[in-house]
Curated annotation (Swiss-Prot):
Organism lineage string: Eukaryota, Viridiplantae, Streptophyta, Embryophyta, Tracheophyta
Disulfide bonds: 80-151
Membrane topology term: Multi-pass membrane protein
Keywords, ordered alphabetically: Abscisic acid signaling pathway, Acetylation, Brassinosteroid signaling pathway, Cell cycle, Cell membrane, Cytokinin signaling pathway, Disulfide bond, G-protein coupled receptor, Gibberellin signaling pathway, Glycoprotein, Lipid metabolism, Membrane, Receptor, Transducer, Transmembrane, Transmembrane helix
Subcellular locations according to the entry: Cell membrane
Gene encoding the protein: GCR1
Name of the protein in question: G-protein coupled receptor 1
Organism (species): Arabidopsis thaliana (Mouse-ear cress)
Length: 326
């Protein structure tokens, strides 16, 4: 038991089992969500535009990060080391891809540039190159020990410091960059919208609702990284202050929210109107008519929704005529 407590930083074997189960379950959800976006990109040609290509790379990084979080086993040396390096590499790549999406949106909307597709090679060099560099630097502080269910975290003071500098420092740099960038984009669009309202007497309410929905969606993007890694950052700082004492509930929140990052990204970035439209069109082609009624309204093909509404209107008219005759 003493060996378990030492390796787990004060956690019991039961605590470690619970955290491991949470990590596996949350990582599996992220893997499925990210794999779904990757599959949609591969199957639907209409999604292979530059903007969604960046989302594809983000989902691919999340998928591989989630996969290695699942397969890591602290009881097996080689697999443990492999998980530590690959998880670090792909998790860093994931939040770096979010900065390229923010940069692309800012360059297009705020600076009115149309050359973003020419920057794809630079994006790859920036994301994969930076991820490789910080992963190699992290190996210098690797003391070949693990903490809890993850082979990714370190127990030694030097390992903790290097881990913080090579992951959490660039992570919060990306969060600050994304937040500032989306703030500028949203402010730019809102100012343009006010000018449009001032120049016209009538504004399409439907367009307004759609624009506000998009603006609100962009505002949530930086919150995904904050929600995924805030508890992990607090836990790492706590490890510095009290290295021999682990807080169980904080470890649960750390592992659970971090492992769900891929799922959050797949929903926010990937499951957009273009993806839903592509799915609707395939459902309309292959799904039998009798199964439409069992689908939620937002998943039904558009033509079927129109037909369903027309049928409802006709049935209401028939019932009204019947009442009038009576």
């Amino acid at each position: 038991m003493s060996a378990v407590l030492t390796a787990g930083g004060g956690l019991t074997a039961g605590d470690r089992s619970i955290i491991t189960a949470i990590n596996t379950g949350a990582s599996s959800l992220s893997f499925v969500g990210s794999a779904f976006i990757v599959l949609c990109y591969c199957l639907f040609k209409e999604l292979r535009k530059f903007s969604f290509k960046l989302v594809f790379y983000l989902a691919l990084s999340d998928m591989l990060c989630s996969f290695f979080l699942i397969v890591g086993d602290p009881s097996k040396g080689f697999i443990c080391y492999a998980q530590g390096y690959t998880t670090h590499f792909f998790c860093v790549a994931s939040f770096l891809w979010t900065t390229t999406i923010a940069f692309t949106l800012h360059r297009t909307v705020v600076k009115h540039k149309t050359d973003v597709e020419d920057l794809e090679a630079m994006f790859h060099l920036y994301v994969w190159g930076t991820s490789l560099v910080v992963t190699v630097i992290r190996s210098f502080g690797n003391n070949h020990s693990h903490l809890g269910p993850w082979c990714w975290t370190q127990t030694g003071l030097k390992g903790k410091a290097v881990h913080f500098l090579t992951f959490y420092a660039p992570l919060w740099g990306a969060i600050l960059y994304n937040g500032f960038t989306y703030f500028q984009v949203i402010r730019m669009l809102r100012n343009a919208r006010r000018m449009a309202v001032g120049m016209s007497d009538r504004v399409d309410q439907f367009d307004n609702r759609a624009e506000l929905k998009v603006l609100n969606r962009w505002g949530y993007y930086p919150l995904i990284l904050i929600g995924s890694w805030a508890f992990g950052t607090i836990n790492r700082i706590h490890d510095f202050i009290e290295p021999g004492h682990k807080i169980f509930w904080l470890s649960v929140l750390d592992v659970g929210t971090a492992a769900l990052m891929g799922l959050f990204n797949s929903i926010a970035y990937g499951f957009n109107s273009s993806v839903r439209r592509a799915i609707h069109e395939r459902l309309e082609l292959f799904l039998p008519e009798r199964l439409y009624r069992w689908l939620p309204s937002n998943f039904r093909p558009k033509n079927h929704l129109i037909l369903h509404q027309q049928q409802q209107q006709r049935s209401e008219m028939v019932s009204l005529k019947t009442e009038d005759q009576q």
